[in-house]
Amino acid sequence: MRILTICGIGDIHWVMLKMESFIEKECKGVIPEITVWNFDGRPRADGFVSRIPFVKFAGYDNEPMGRQQKRLFHEMYMEGFKDVVSGFKGYDYFICVNGSLRIGHSMETIMRQYSTNWNYKINTEDCISPYSEPYIIFYFSNHGMFTDWVAKMPPEKIRSFMQQIKGYKLILTGSSWDSPFNQELEDNGVINLCGKTSLTELFGLIKGASAFVGWCGGNTIVSQHLNTPTLMLWSNYFSHRAFQTNWVDPDRLGKVYIPMDVETANNDSLMKNLGVLLGK
């Protein structure tokens, strides 16, 4: 069984919430091969898929999008017209639930014939933090759609917030393409690890962190799944507010995961919600 997914870690995580039930009903007990469509030229999901025990990573499909492929991608990624397509690009299935989540559908109603496992297994036993003292990790970027986030919460506002946090090491994380922006956030001993960690090292940092604060990305999406307190910052770039919570285990809402809008966030509200997650 060959399954194609899109390329982001968060995108794949949302599919995996349904995958065990999908395998049981459609794959007849055979472990499916997951190929990641690397249409944006930023391969970053192999280390994630390889950690999921009920699937096998089969590599990347590096073919760019053609016109007809873009049309279907838009329907699945943006509009939620489809979640599962058979035979696309020669694969048994192409699965993408982003569009349905984006327009406000709940995970329980997406691919409703398959149950949701909010606690599916990600193998992270070898992911160990190098820090013994308390620390908080952060994810900020000005890449792609995140220019909208930065317009509402620019570097000086981020630095002002981080300066309010006492008693924790502050660690910036992200990919190599996030590094130039995060250099603007280095202040008062802040540690910048953007582009300097493998996925194994990042997962170790996430597991050992007192909290993770930052934009809505694959890293913060997986953070709450690993039960690290996660303060996720959203923008009205996404019109449906349900998208902030419709993919999260209801038992984690308000306890492990709190969403906020960058448009209205200030130091007081950020510190209040961070305090809730830290148990203060």
Predicted features by range, described:
Residues 1-280:
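Catalytic machinery of carbohydrate-active enzymes
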